[in-house]
Amino acid sequence: MNVMDSFSLKGKVALVTGASYGIGFAIACALSDAGATIVFNDIKQELVDKGLAAYAERGITAHGYVCDVTDEAAVNAMVAAIEKEVGVIDILVNNAGIIKRIPMCDMTAEQFRQVIDVDLNAPFIVSKAVIPSMISKGHGKIINICSMMSELGRETVSAYAAAKGGLKMLTKNIASEYGGYNIQCNGIGPGYIATPQTAPLREVQPDGSRHPFDQFILAKTPANRWGVPEDLGAPAVFLASDASNFVNGHILYVDGGILAYIGKQP
């Protein structure tokens, strides 16, 4: 077999959560380019409609569902509907996520729980819903969208870092528990990616200068740029395809080298 054939996703059904725009949308487009049928969800109908229109502009016929991925009953109903209307899910990308940039001592317990619920509990809930059919089918791929904050800490993101660190370990445990069923569970850890979530960190200042955080990230990233959502597409195709059949429980950091870099000597 030609090695490139192992990257084909023809005949596969891929569910990407929270994929109306941003990183999830870019990953779903890449999976479609490799041949997969795309299913996505979002929390509001208007977001699903915008997503469907965006996919259509790319020439992709996607299937969109309204679902709150923190609601186990709603997730189970969505997965059952997908299996009936589209097919058994071969590839799951747990992408849906939120971040609240609040100093820890200013954050309420409820705000902390909200982040944990979306960024950690939801991947558990959705994975739990799709794994039984993957076992029955004899294969499956789960990709959890982790973060550099799975490894690092910094001010104002305590809940996010706790959730993404937990997601890293959930990834390893799913791989350990279900690897014997030919299910591979890996993660992608994005660096700083130019998305609507990070737009406030890249705003040009009134004097025309870069935002201080923007300057900080460029100085800390050997690639000397922010990533773009499309940077995550090819890594996702690799982890979703037969090319990664002996890769399990790993986090692939797509961060421009920031985790490897201690910084310039003063």
Model-predicted regions and their roles:
Residues 2-5, 152, 237, 248-266:
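Short C-terminal tail/terminal secondary-structure segment
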Residues 13, 20-22:
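Conserved glycine-rich cofactor-binding loop
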Residues 102-105, 152-158, 180-181, 224, ...:
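Active-site loop immediately N-terminal to the catalytic Tyr-X3-Lys motif
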Residues 127, 163, 171:
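Active-site helix of classical SDR
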Residues 132, 176-180, 245:
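Alpha-helical segment proximal to the catalytic Tyr-Lys
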